[in-house]
Amino acid sequence: MQLNMLKCKLHQACVTDTELDYEGSCAIDANLMDAAGIREFEQIHVYNLANGARFTTYAIRGEAGSRMISMNGAAAHLCSEGDRIIICCYANVDESELDRHEPALVYCDGDNRITHQRNGIPLQVA
């Protein structure tokens, strides 16, 4: 059986720009994409921490080192500059491979600098 599992995420990334009339949906600094393992034109899920919007779009490569996260086209209606977001990708993983599956988790500060990376989420306790 195939299960749809978290492949990677950019956690607490900050929207740097919105371009309603730009072709392409979400431009992400190429260094951030590489760190997380996001491929150009890969489907991404965006969760906006500022307004609760959740939507699906695709990633395009932004200039390396720019720290840009630009929401383009229709996605520009769902985010504002300065909004903190989570960008996730999912992948189908065979049930027999689940014990070896480790998502790439990349954590960002307010300037989209990578603060740390890990391959799992700590246990949430009551």
UniProtKB/Swiss-Prot annotation:
- Entry binding sites for substrate: 57, 73-75
Q: Which UniProt keywords apply?
A: Autocatalytic cleavage, Cytoplasm, Decarboxylase, Lyase, Pantothenate biosynthesis, Pyruvate, Schiff base, Zymogen
Q: Which Gene3D superfamilies does the entry link to? A: 2.40.40.20
Locate the active site: 25 (schiff-base intermediate with substrate), 58 (proton donor)
Q: What subcellular compartments does it reside in?
A: Cytoplasm
Give the record's GO biological process terms: alanine biosynthetic process; pantothenate biosynthetic process
Q: Is Lyase one of the keywords UniProt gives this record?
A: yes
InterPro entries on file: Asp_de-COase-like_dom_sf (IPR009010), Asp_decarbox (IPR003190)
What pathway, per the record?
A: Cofactor biosynthesis; (R)-pantothenate biosynthesis; beta-alanine from L-aspartate: step 1/1
Q: Which GO terms describe its cellular component?
A: cytosol
Q: What is its main location?
A: cytoplasm
Query: What is the recorded name of this protein?
Result: Aspartate 1-decarboxylase
In its UniProt entry, the species of origin is given as Alkalilimnicola ehrlichii (strain ATCC BAA-1101 / DSM 17681 / MLHE-1)
Tell me the gene name. panD
